[in-house]
């Protein structure tokens, strides 16, 4: 039986996996979400010796069950290849008291590569499957990493255009240059004078604008998304949690069946939601620890069951988590209220109208899976230094948020279960923050800090940032947040 993906806001709006990938966001504003979970046989006696690609085949064939085996083989072999700088794709590193799952070995040195290297192949395969001749326009808001990873994935892919919006003052210098120097005739990057929430809200508005959709259709185009709102972004992220567990079994750190915790630095809630889906298909998960920075709306939600975005937006050293409207939480809410689309829609409309919603009558077993805490700026910097001094290993600030939150969790609960930290970016993406935390040195430029980081860590400077300083800037457009749609129409000649 083919798996059904339903909009979180309309029980009648159901599609297959390939249709969900092509649409990105449901036309009613909801997110396509599985209403039941596939049956997957996770035999870790076998999986411990499986390659990343083999684990991907097992997981993806379960969730994307209207793709043929040959189609998935094609997508997987083209995605997880020499673009990654290690055959392991996502190596697990044992540190003092924790395991870091390094998700930054792809072409843009951030975890988004894990899904965005395969999403273009999913899309072009799905388009062929449905005889779609429209040009697919990828419209994406980024808090720093998705934009570059999406453009790297879609650059010069036939039949696609990609337009990325980022907050002008809300990304690191390295992140900005990675985007503005992006090659590819179909790539477009636009800075906005707002924050990530402004960018994401306006992108969602464009997806839901019927008149704009009709204008696109008249020009043989249609929108899709490379954000984690797209199920094709989310499902590949389930793979690395299963792979990490298999590596723990392989190295004798755990026995098969032993429960493991995952601590995930969380902004838009996609990465930790993928860990939740891994649990739903049988991965032995103890706790999912949701780590936030000072934009701690999720920490408060898990403690009070009230989601309240009415608070100061803080610009931090972990910009990919500087988010107050956490889009993917909608999928968890949908599951928490028993897959009730009417109730989910009411809550989401309340968020727009009043800036908050309160959860009542929810599945306590699901909520009990999660623990949540946050790390402030000082704690994040201190954690980078602590890990370096303990393990001679430098974490990026997002990973350090998760690492610091895990230290708090362990102290407060006494939980000694093995814990994997999702290490979401290379420190080379945030060199100034990393070097300053370790050495106390201030006032460094980004490229000066890259050299110092190399000396401190002994890790080679990755190609993603090597030469960035002298790469030609190709994208110069900057607009007011309110003018985003006009910019899109201009680029597409509508």
Where do the protein language model's features map onto the residues?
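PLP-dependent amino-acid enzyme catalytic core
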Residues: 1-494
